[in-house]
Amino acid sequence: MRVFGVDPGLTRCGFGVVDVAANRSASLVAVGVIGSSSELPLSQRLLVISESIDQWLDTHSPDVLAVERVFSQTNLSTVMGVAQASGIVIAAAAKRGIAVALHTPSEVKAAVTGNGRADKIAVTAMVTRILKLKVAPTPADAADALALAITHAWRSGPGSTAAAGELTPARKLWLEAEAKARKNVEKSSKQRR
C-alpha cells in the first residue's frame, strides 16, 4: 500500500510518501517540505500548496492520503492556516478519487512511538528507525508527514484504503478504548466528590 502523509501548514507543509507491505515493513518513497512566504497574500500561499500537492499526487499516485486532523490550538491564526492548507490537500485528493484519512497528533505519536505524548524528537527517531534511514528527515514537518503515513498503514491494515468516515477494525478498538477510559475517569472523579 502506498500512503501519502501530509502535515499541513501555511508556512511549512510536510509531505511524505511510504510504501508499506503486508508484514508492516515500510520504505521511503519521497519526503519534502513545501514552504510559502508569510509575505505573500493568502491566496498565493494556498496556490503554492495546491500546485505542490497536485504535482506530488500525480507523481506518486498514492492509494490513500493521511492528513493530520486539525486539533485545538490556542493560536487562532495558526489553526486557520492549518485548516486552510488541509482543505486544499483534501480537495486535491478528492478530485483524483483518492481516499483521505485524518489522524490526531496523539494517535500518530502512539502508533509510531508507543506513547501518545511523545515529543518530536522521539517521533523523528522512530520514523528514522522504522524506515531504516541513514539520516533523520528534517525539518520536523517532514518527519511528521512520514509518521502520518506509517500510522495510517499500520492502523488500517494491509491493502486497506479506508477513509476518514470508514472505521477500520483498529480504529473501532481505539475508539472503544478511549470511551472506556473516559468513563473510568468520570467514574473516579464522581467517587472523589
Swiss-Prot record:
Subunit composition and interactions: Homodimer which binds Holliday junction (HJ) DNA. The HJ becomes 2-fold symmetrical on binding to RuvC with unstacked arms; it has a different conformation from HJ DNA in complex with RuvA. In the full resolvosome a probable DNA-RuvA(4)-RuvB(12)-RuvC(2) complex forms which resolves the HJ.
Family: Belongs to the RuvC family.
SUPFAM superfamilies: Ribonuclease H-like
Catalytic activity: Endonucleolytic cleavage at a junction such as a reciprocal single-stranded crossover between two homologous DNA duplexes (Holliday junction)
Subcellular location: Cytoplasm
Pfam families xrefs: RuvC
Alphabetized InterPro entries for the sequence: RNaseH-like_sf, RNaseH_sf, X-over_junc_endoDNase_Mg_BS, X-over_junc_endoDNase_RuvC
Name of the encoding gene: ruvC
Residue positions binding Mg(2+) 1: D7, D141
Cited function: The RuvA-RuvB-RuvC complex processes Holliday junction (HJ) DNA during genetic recombination and DNA repair. Endonuclease that resolves HJ intermediates. Cleaves cruciform DNA by making single-stranded nicks across the HJ at symmetrical positions within the homologous arms, yielding a 5'-phosphate and a 3'-hydroxyl group; requires a central core of homology in the junction. The consensus cleavage sequence is 5'-(A/T)TT(C/G)-3'. Cleavage occurs on the 3'-side of the TT dinucleotide at the point of strand exchange.
UniProt-listed GO biological process terms: DNA recombination; DNA repair
Gene Ontology CC: one annotated term: Holliday junction resolvase complex
The EC number(s) this enzyme carries: 3.1.21.10
Coiled-coil region: none
Protein name per the record: Crossover junction endodeoxyribonuclease RuvC
Primary location group: cytoplasm
Binding-site positions, Mg(2+) 2: E68
Source species of the chain: Renibacterium salmoninarum (strain ATCC 33209 / DSM 20767 / JCM 11484 / NBRC 15589 / NCIMB 2235)
UniProt entry tagged with the keyword Ligase: no
Catalytic site: D7, E68, D141
Gene3D superfamilies, alphabetized: Ribonuclease H-like superfamily/Ribonuclease H
Cofactor note (record): Binds 2 Mg(2+) ion per subunit.
Names of required cofactors: Mg(2+)
